[in-house]
């Protein structure tokens, strides 16, 4: 572990819609508590119809006014369904009101029936989601860097689009120009791919990360740290080949976990939670691949293993009804093991 580890919490902005004891006010309070407990960042997810949750940019705006230090991130924003000009304007505003604390985690959208239906409802062709995603990030990044963009793509054609009309003091820009962007890649989250397919998927994923982002956001299979090592090795090699410093690439892992007094009780609670939260995915993915479940020591051992594989930022999603209790226990009993 050469880099200092950073710990964030995903506040689980879907939970207030399914758990009456964790309403939206409690979620905002928890963001403040996370800052007080020593977390480095707080994160929210994004899903409009597939798994409905409170809208992430609005939530982070509210959190920005109640916190001073923690970074504010999305894990992750489904950029393929967002208008790139609006995304740039909204994110620049968030970065300004938070005084430059944002991290934009972005993904294309998973290949699930419910996600396909979401694209259909929004009038977007699911088959084009990768192209829509890439063009969205290219355009938004340019607007958040220079305040203007010209772009001639497959899905977007923009000429002299600018956040400056000539009457303002200057273009509408974020504090960070641009804010850091983490690109999601989980090329091996499902089994059954041949070695050639895996290699091709990994090559494309690394290329996309380097073209569009400043780092890699993943939720690779939790029993396979070698998958992180393998993709990170490819990512670092490709970065060097393109003249970028590999050490400047952030590697963030969003991990779903559950801390219990014993492994048996923790697993039972976690299984029930995942089945209710992810009814489709829970049927096809091994429960053990979601993340570490067990005692404080077991959770810490898992983090150490993946830190050695190259992860420098852990975004913790707690698979439990008691979000605040899990967050506090992790901060007080797990995080000190990794602090100087």
Question: Where are the predicted features?
Answer:
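Active-site-adjacent structural elements that line small-molecule/cofactor binding pockets in enzymes
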Residues: 1-340
């Amino acid at each position: 572990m050469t880099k200092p580890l950073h710990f964030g919490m995903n506040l689980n902005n879907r939970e207030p819609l399914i758990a009456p004891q964790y309403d939206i006010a409690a979620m905002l309070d928890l963001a403040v508590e996370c800052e007080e407990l020593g977390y480095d960042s707080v994160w929210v997810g994004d899903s409009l119809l597939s798994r409905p949750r409170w809208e992430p940019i609005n939530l982070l705006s509210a959190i920005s006014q109640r916190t001073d230090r923690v970074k504010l991130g999305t894990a992750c924003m489904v950029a393929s369904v967002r208008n790139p000009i609006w995304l740039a304007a909204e994110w620049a505003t968030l970065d300004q009101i938070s005084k430059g604390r944002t991290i934009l985690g972005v993904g294309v959208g998973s290949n699930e029936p419910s996600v396909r239906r979401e694209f259909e409802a929004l009038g977007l062709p699911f088959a084009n989601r990768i192209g829509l995603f890439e063009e969205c990030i290219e355009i938004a990044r340019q607007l958040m860097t220079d305040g203007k963009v010209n772009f001639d793509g497959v899905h977007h054609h923009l000429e002299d689009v600018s956040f400056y009309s000539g009457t303002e003091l200057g273009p509408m820009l974020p504090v960070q120009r641009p804010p850091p962007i983490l690109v999601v890649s989980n090329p091996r989250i499902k089994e059954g791919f041949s070695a050639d397919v895996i290699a091709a998927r990994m090559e494309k994923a690394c290329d996309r990360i380097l073209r569009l982002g400043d780092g890699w956001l993943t939720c690779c299979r939790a029993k396979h740290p070698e998958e992180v090592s393998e993709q990170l090795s490819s990512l670092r090699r490709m970065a060097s080949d393109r003249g970028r410093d590999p050490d400047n690439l952030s590697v963030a892992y969003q991990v779903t976990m559950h801390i219990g007094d014993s492994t048996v009780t923790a697993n039972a609670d976690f299984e029930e939670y995942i089945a209710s939260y992810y009814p489709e995915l829970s049927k096809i993915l091994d429960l053990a691949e979601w993340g570490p479940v067990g005692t404080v020591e077991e959770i810490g051992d898992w983090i150490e293993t993946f830190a050695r594989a190259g992860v420098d930022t852990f975004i913790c999603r707690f698979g439990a009804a008691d979000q605040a209790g899990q967050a506090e226990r992790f901060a007080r009993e797990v995080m000190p093991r990794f602090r100087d």
